[in-house]
């Protein structure tokens, strides 16, 4: 029986025209997509970088209240005080240089040394007292008088990247504040009431000047200086009481040397962050752009930890490394999230909101934890605002507590007894009773059982 062999049909042995057409279309679309991908990748990799300095006008407007005040400028006097501080170190202890703290002013008011756990020796105390005498001969108190009287504070605006703006004056101002604290302690022991109050106001003035600038660290240094001044005044208030006229002078000094609101520093941080976002992203015509890791690493020292690996985008040649920015939020998206956070912060510190209720309005730390990890610049550069706000609240509470302590002592000095309630201090001594910045409630007060007994302390 003959065997029949099946003949393959043309449609089974080769693609149909329709299949070939579909394959060509898919290939063409793939090549087109690849071309678009390459073109957009090249645009990201080769895009011109953003530039720093776009927000100089905003910085100037922010600081205008402190720069437009009438009278002399405090900032040149800060430079003069720093120069005298160098001369003071050289003359007070010429054999060891500026890094030796054996003649520190802390020896006059603290039981522990800065560099060890021993208390100050008599030699330490004598060196500190000698340094205070040398400072007076150099004219340092007179310079601090001019700083206290000056309402204007004009530190030069930042040029270039704000994040690289150096603040060397802050450390020197803290040194000068410790010098003032040493003067206060020495004057308390010797009964020089005018010198004690003058040194107190000098320290407050240094804090005010530092805090009248645009960064959070400026503000926190001002807070720390004020805390030191208030603590030193209160510590000696019972054992070394001030006469009524000097109690009034200390109250007036507090009113003359207030810290500016922390809202100014927070707005300065926002402008600084926007500046960093601007120059770490490319500059596209629609005011958008992509993060450029290589540029950021070169300018900010980002090559740490895993960034030291040769595989990390920050170590790639700039055009190639910039491709990593394609997978991160754009400049516009990053700016929007940064503004969202700072707007929430400003709402939370509005007048009338006590510290205990602040996080119910906006919790910066919780917000930052919930921010996606790919918002690199925001997550990396936003400071710990929770701690900063706590320091500000603490300084406000210490200021108002010191004001009340001075008022109570003034009432005692003029009436031979402490007040029965804080209400007796108004309006003869204080225009109004302060409110606790933390609780939002009035300060508590319990009069001593024996009005004739000395105050146990503040």
Predicted regions and their residues:
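Short acidic linear motifs
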Residues: 2-458
